[in-house]
Amino acid sequence: MKIHEYQAKEILRRHKANVPFGVVIDKKENASKAHDEVTSKTGGSVVVVKAQIHAGGRGKGGGVKVTKTKEDAIAAVDKILGMQLITPQTGPEGKKVLKVYLEQGIDIAKEYYLSILLDRSIRKTIIMASTEGGMEIEEVAETHPEKILKIAIDPGIGLQVNQARQLAFELGLPAESHKSFQSLLAAIYEAYIKEDASLLEINPLILTKQNEIIAGDCKIDLDENALYRHADNAAFRDITEEDPLEVQASEFNLNYVKLDGNIGCMVNGAGLAMATMDIVKLAGAEPANFLDVGGGANKTTVTNGFKIILGDPNVKGIFVNIFGGIVRCDMVAEGIIEAAKAVDLKVPLVVRLQGTNSELGREVLNKSGLKITGVDDLREAASTIAKLIG
């Protein structure tokens, strides 16, 4: 689950990490009060106004402004709050800014990159760091891979002091900042483990002119499967930042991810769903979604799946690919017919049924009188739907 920067920093504060003081607001009339609270608390005059959306690259899109006066801060809030912010991660449609974070300005000497995540190839948590702070880490990996440092953490013993010290030396941090760096690294590692995060990223990690190490920006992704252990973190969910179709799908207990193509895919099983998307692309078309209706697919599930798929105006055709194991293909076929009638289906529909009662399922579809194209071969089915949408 993605959360906002101000929420991520709230988590870091729980674990005594050094983060700037800030105030979040969702109304422009609260800008003056928020500015005063930040400056009176910190004693400084510089306030950074940051758009709060679930996407990176906010600064490049005009969503981050450094202000030196109260008037400038109010003007920045007025401009950013409510804007449609477009960044490299939002897509061309952008995201509407519904909250802004007014934060204490920091006297920056140098910026670094720091993150904690799971490396599945070695089955361990790793710490990644770089001297190239403030940049997209993917860009650094492509242009200067030698500037990315990695340390693997033994899950049995956790982060060790010597590892933190080693990383400080390899980053070239001044000796006066090592204690501050080790303290922050220990705090964010504790946060990553205890809060069940799947990613914790600080970019930039700031070295101040006073040799303090501070988390300038923070991104945390939380493991949704562990939220039952963290009621306070579950409350951080902001559905206004999520795709409405994905929210609706979660209410139906469907695994749905919206994509940019025009062929809606309905499949049972995540592996088959991935293979279906691949075969659609090989046929020269683009999948509009990932949709796994699960092993217990029934009439209601299929109808809800159709509603989700057709909620995307880009969908020009639907490819249903079902392998009957636990689920019976004839029951799925009945669900497809019922769903097609319920949603008044007007786009081409190709159905591939294999497995338990697949022949009976095909017979049910053939007798329905609906314009449904049944195909047995996977590659042929993908080619058929690609041709039908032109």
Swiss-Prot record:
Keywords noted in UniProt: ATP-binding, Ligase, Magnesium, Metal-binding, Nucleotide-binding, Tricarboxylic acid cycle
UniProt: substrate binding residues: 268, 325-327
Enzyme Commission no: 6.2.1.5
Superkingdom per UniProt: Bacteria
KW Metal-binding (keyword) present: yes
Entry note: cofactor: Binds 1 Mg(2+) ion per subunit.
Annotated SUPFAM superfamilies: Glutathione synthetase ATP-binding domain-like (SSF56059), Succinyl-CoA synthetase domains (SSF52210)
Domain ATP-grasp: 9-248
PROSITE patterns: ATP_GRASP, SUCCINYL_COA_LIG_3
Gene3D superfamilies registered for this protein in UniProt: ATP-grasp fold, A domain, ATP-grasp fold, B domain, Succinyl-CoA synthetase domains
Pathway: Carbohydrate metabolism; tricarboxylic acid cycle; succinate from succinyl-CoA (ligase route): step 1/1
Swiss-Prot/TrEMBL GO biological process terms: succinyl-CoA metabolic process; tricarboxylic acid cycle
CC cofactor: Mg(2+)
GO molecular function, one term: ATP binding
One Gene Ontology CC term in the entry: succinate-CoA ligase complex
Membrane recorded as keyword: no
Principal EC category: ligase
Residues reported to bind ATP: 50, 57-59, 103, 106, 111
Reaction(s) catalysed (UniProt annotation): succinate + ATP + CoA = succinyl-CoA + ADP + phosphate; GTP + succinate + CoA = succinyl-CoA + GDP + phosphate
Function: Succinyl-CoA synthetase functions in the citric acid cycle (TCA), coupling the hydrolysis of succinyl-CoA to the synthesis of either ATP or GTP and thus represents the only step of substrate-level phosphorylation in the TCA. The beta subunit provides nucleotide specificity of the enzyme and binds the substrate succinate, while the binding sites for coenzyme A and phosphate are found in the alpha subunit.
Family matches, as HAMAP family: Succ_CoA_beta (MF_00558)
Subunit comment: Heterotetramer of two alpha and two beta subunits.
Similarity field: Belongs to the succinate/malate CoA ligase beta subunit family.
Name of the molecule in the record: Succinate--CoA ligase [ADP-forming] subunit beta
Record organism: Leptospira interrogans serogroup Icterohaemorrhagiae serovar Lai (strain 56601)
